[in-house]
Amino acid sequence: MNISYVDWLRERVGSRKVFLPFATVVLRDSQDRILLQQRTDFDFWGMPGGVLELDEDWETCARRELSEETGLEVGSLRLVGVYTDPRYDVTYPNGDQVQQFTICFEGAVCGGEMKPDGVESRDQLFLPAEELASYPIPRWYRDMIADALQGGSPSFRSPFALAQTRDQISSVRPFVGPARFSAVGAAFIITREDGHILMLKQAAEGAWRPPAGFCQLGENVAHTAVRVARQETGLRIDPQRILGVYA
C-alpha cells in the first residue's frame, strides 16, 4: 500500500464513522515529566501516536509514530490500557468521524532529538504531572495519563454501549470490496471456578477456539466481550483483566 491506511480507507468510505486502531505513548523524560504535543488539526494538547498500518503490530506502530511526530526514541514499553469507549469519539475538522480503538503504552526517552514534525504536531514540551491540569487535554488522553500514573495492571473501562450500535463490518465492506481492512474485536478466556477454560468448536472448520467477536460501533471492547459471550455461549461474564493486545 503506497498511501497510508487511513487515507486509503477514507478514499472509499468518506467521512462516515469507522473504527480506527491507534497506538499512543505516554513518554517520560529523565525527570519523570510527561511529553505533551500540540496538534495541528485541533487546538488541544495530547500525546504522540497514530493509526496502525496493515501488517504492523501495536508496539511497532507506537514507536514509529513517536519517532515521526517528535524525533524521539523510547526504550521498553509497558501496556497502560485499551481505550475504545464511544464517549471518546472524535469528529475531525474535515468531518471525518472516528470511534477510537486505542492501545496506550508508556516508556522513557532513550534517544533522538525532539523536534515537532510540523504536520501533526506544532509544539511539544515535557511537563510535571501536577502541571497538566492547566492545559486543554481531551478526556481520553487524561484517562490514559491517569492510568499510567496509577500503574498496575493494564486498564480498560467497564462495559458500555450507546442505545444504538452498528455492525462495523457491514459499515465498511460494501465500500472496500474484498480488500483487507482493520476490523477490531475481542477474544476472551472464560474460566470456571475449577480453572477449566471454555472452548467453542466451530461448525464449519471443526477447530476449537475461545469465544471471540468483532466490536460494534457504539460499544467499548468490554461490552463486546459481554455481548459475544452471551450470544455464543448463553453465559453472563464479568471482564476481569486484559491478557494482551494482538495485531
Feature annotation, model-predicted:
Residues 1-24, 150-187:
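Acidic, metal-coordinating catalytic segment for phosphate/diphosphate chemistry
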Residues 19, 97-101, 180-182, 206:
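Residue-level preference for beta-strand/loop junctions
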Residues 26, 36, 104-106, 126, ...:
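Conserved hydrophobic/aromatic beta-strand scaffold that supports enzyme active sites
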